[in-house]
Amino acid sequence: MTFLKRVKEYVGDAFRAAKYIGQGMGVVFDHMGRRPVTVQYPFEKLIPSERFRGRIHFEFDKCIACEICVRVCPIDLPVVDWAYNPELKKKELYSYSIDFGVCIFCANCVEFCPTNCLSVTEDYELATYDRHDLNYHQVAMGRLPSKVTEDPMVTPLREFAYLPKGVIDPHDLPAGSQRAGKRPEEILAEMRAAKAAKEAEAKAAKAAAE
């Protein structure tokens, strides 16, 4: 009886082992047909999506020190240093800073800013060796980042950032797959074509009137 029990356990263990090996090989075979997804950073970079919220850009001259950004921030992050100027009868901004080591990039400050002095950029390269370097003041926040598409030293990887509508897996896509919506260069081309057509219509109308 003990012998038969041991044989039964052995056969059961063998079937379980075969099942687990089959599951593992299924994962292996599934990945064998996929395209490589390794990004050779920093020589290859992803193009951020249309609504990507990266580093916040700040324009010092537009800020009126209303501190709305501080009130709408979930963690009261922006530090606004100002003083009232009795001669001008308004606030005078001295400094403005945001610690991106704490920021959650919700962009509430951008949405509620009455003067549009804050805006989100496509800059996501904020890594540093010292967390104190992530505390950006108005000068650092005033710098505009360079675009990935305009950097000759970088290969922009469009296919991993822009997928067709309804597709969430970047693998096994046809070579000519396009993302949902239009790319920036396509939008610019349409705007230029519309402008040229409008100018042509205006010239034709002017010529007809003469």
Swiss-Prot record:
InterPro entries: 4Fe4S_Fe-S-bd, 4Fe4S_Fe_S_CS, NADH_quinone_OxRdtase_chainI, NDHI
Catalytic activity: a plastoquinone + NADH + (n+1) H(+)(in) = a plastoquinol + NAD(+) + n H(+)(out); a plastoquinone + NADPH + (n+1) H(+)(in) = a plastoquinol + NADP(+) + n H(+)(out)
Listed Pfam families: Fer4_7
EC number(s) given by UniProt: 7.1.1.-
GO cellular component: a single term: plasma membrane-derived thylakoid membrane
Gene3D superfamilies in UniProt: 3.30.70.3270
Keyword hit for Translocase: yes
Residues that, per the record, bind [4Fe-4S] cluster 2: C73, C103, C106, C109
Location of the 4Fe-4S ferredoxin-type domain: 54-83, 94-123
Highest taxon listed in the record's lineage: Bacteria
Cofactor binding description: Binds 2 [4Fe-4S] clusters per subunit.
Residues binding [4Fe-4S] cluster 1: C63, C66, C69, C113
Gene Ontology molecular function terms on file: 4 iron, 4 sulfur cluster binding; iron ion binding; NADH dehydrogenase (ubiquinone) activity; quinone binding
HAMAP family: NDH1_NuoI
PANTHER family the UniProt entry points to: NAD(P)H-QUINONE OXIDOREDUCTASE SUBUNIT I, CHLOROPLASTIC (PTHR47275:SF1)
Assembly and interaction partners: NDH-1 is composed of at least 11 different subunits.
Record-given protein name: NAD(P)H-quinone oxidoreductase subunit I
Gene that specifies this protein: ndhI
